[in-house]
Amino acid sequence: MQKRILVLAAGILQVPVIKRAREMGYYVITADGDPNACGLKFADKAIVANITSEEEMLRVAREEKIDGVIHPCSEVSMNVMGRINDELHLSGISKDQAIRATNKHLMREAFEAYGAPSPKSRCFTDVEVAWGAFCMDFTGACILKPSRNSGSRGIAKINSNIQMDEFARLFEIAKGESRDKQVMLEQFIEGPEFSIEIIVWDGQVNVLTVTDKKTTEAPHFVELGHNQPSCFPAETVKKIKAAAVAGVKALGVNNCACHAEVKVQDGEPFIMEIGARMGGDFISTVLTPLSTGVDMIAAAVNCALGIGPCLQPITKPQGVCIRYFCPKPGVLKSISNTEALEDSRVYEWEIYHKVGDIIPEVTSSLCRSGHVIVTEETPQKAIAYAERLISEVIFETE
């Protein structure tokens, strides 16, 4: 009998998962609250529904007699997915595991209890209590971030000489972006940032690859690009992988994809956070399959259905890099030289804005204007060519 899988969300990042699951021969039901979500048309059955409502999505799951559920590249419905798995006795993470993997405070507690390396941190709802802790218990720069949110929204770096009024302003911004209205105050780790793409099956933590990240500077740390495999020394990559594995084991998640984020300071890794899901920014859906030859989408889909994933390369590994267009803020007057993107080394490209749009300052990943993905023999060559293309496409703003 044909397996039935429910995909929670149908945005641009979920489209590759919806398409691949159908190619694998599964019946795909996709739900999204936006009737115009671009992925709905690719599913066998599209449902417009509130994917953050546990009761509504549990009703859909029962009516559709699903065999598995997946919420790729997003965190807003992780608890919903966990509840469905619990109630219908499906493969994949439980609701308790979903809560632990989306609440940064609980996540840090799990890391500390297990001995997985992570920055010193505390969680607050009251700005005055947070300010007192910052002054008394922390030294040097820190990060304020929403306790429950994904992406870079609401994150700010603060220095030791910050005034209370500015601290309070940034605290309230982070609180406004947090789904549980709690704010994390954490030690700032100075150093390069990485992500680790993982498949967990039957208790085994399988690291597929390590991703180098390029971000803006403080205060927002918006991701400008990624490359795979990592260009860092083998010993550094080994430490990063070990930290990520320890973090996943600390969370206790199973039969799912994981996307860990790690920074390295003075040669030592610190786990920033781990999502029990596929990574966004095309990392898990495009970059990882290209750089490893492993079909990570198929692996994650099969995990959700309780089917053992294939983690062997099925295509030749390549160097791969994604870079994002982030033009000068203003009204977009013209875009020129996009013909430079028509090259065999360009796997895909897209420009998100059109002439007449307002180009915002890049304060979150939602502010970026487009992307290009390049494949090459090595990641170094892919990076060089992607950077060249980013500079050759001209966005005129005023």
Regions found by a protein language model. Give the residues of each.
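Active-site nucleotide/adenylate-binding loops and adjacent lid/helix of ATP-dependent enzymes
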Residues: 103-183, 190, 202-204, 230-246, ...
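Phosphate-binding core of ATP-grasp and ATP-grasp-like enzymes
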Residues: 138, 174-182, 187-229, 238-259, ...
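Short, well-ordered beta-strand elements within core beta-sheets of diverse protein domains
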Residues: 156, 187, 289, 369-376
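A structural supersecondary motif
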Residues: 270-271, 341-358
